[in-house]
């Protein structure tokens, strides 16, 4: 018996895993994020690792304390973090509507990059069996947005829980001119890359 755990409460990441037909549990990391890096790809890998390792530690501790209970023989913990980067600035989730407006004004008519860091922690009966850490990058070109369009979009509430203040899969789709790279990476989880990275080390998540 094996188990997949998503160390995130993001509804978008949940939907992406459901979309490809995986069975999994959700156990979001609750620790405070500590950022020591400044380069976008290093930041997202650092944060994804913190999330995955926090949940992996909880799972390992539980399994150790409840050996008499049947627990999964193999566990895969998936941690992820996404940021938008433009002109040397890292854009996370907006603090408020003014922050969202500043971000969208910055991105309007320009090309930015979306980075998602992923950490995969493998746990077996003996404990931690391995860890993979990587990132995926997608470039996104946005159409020009007028101030009225930006205000109208912010009024929907959609930008407020999203890196860069927009959701490519939502109402902001009409302002996306083109993308270069993995669409799902912009949504929040590069599921193709995850599958391929696991496949390289002999793991088929559909046989997990």
Provide a role label for each language-model segment:
Residues 6-10:
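Glycine-rich beta-to-alpha transition loops that act as phosphate-gripper elements at the mouths
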Residues 12-14:
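Short, glycine/polar-rich helix-capping loops at beta-to-alpha or helix-loop-helix junctions
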Residues 20-22:
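Short, structured coil segments at secondary-structure junctions
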Residues 2-5, 18, 40-208:
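Anionic-ligand binding patches
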Residues 24-25, 177:
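A short, local hydrophobic-aromatic micro-motif
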Residues 35-39:
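Short, charged, surface-exposed secondary-structure boundary motifs
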Residues 25-33:
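A short beta-strand-loop structural module common to alpha/beta enzyme folds
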């Amino acid at each position: 018996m094996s188990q997949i755990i998503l160390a995130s409460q993001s509804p978008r990441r949940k939907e992406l895993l459901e979309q490809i037909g995986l069975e999994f549990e959700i156990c979001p990391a609750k620790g405070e994020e500590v950022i020591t890096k400044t380069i976008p790809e290093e930041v997202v890998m650092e944060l994804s690792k913190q999330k995955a390792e926090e949940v992996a530690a909880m799972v390992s501790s539980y399994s150790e304390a409840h050996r008499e209970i049947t627990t999964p023989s193999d566990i895969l913990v998936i941690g992820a973090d996404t940021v938008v980067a433009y002109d040397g600035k890292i854009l996370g989730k907006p603090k408020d509507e003014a922050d969202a407006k500043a971000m969208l004004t910055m991105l309007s008519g320009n090309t930015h990059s979306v980075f998602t860091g992923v950490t995969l922690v493998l746990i077996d009966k003996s404990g931690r069996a391995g860890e993979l850490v990587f990132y995926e990058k997608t470039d996104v070109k946005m159409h020009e947005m007028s101030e009225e369009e930006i205000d109208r979009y912010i009024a929907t509430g959609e930008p407020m829980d999203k890196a860069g203040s927009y959701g490519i899969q939502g109402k902001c789709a009409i302002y996306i001119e083109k993308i270069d790279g993995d669409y799902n990476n912009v949504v929040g989880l590069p599921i193709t890359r995850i599958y391929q990275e696991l496949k390289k080390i002999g793991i088929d998540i559909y046989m997990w």
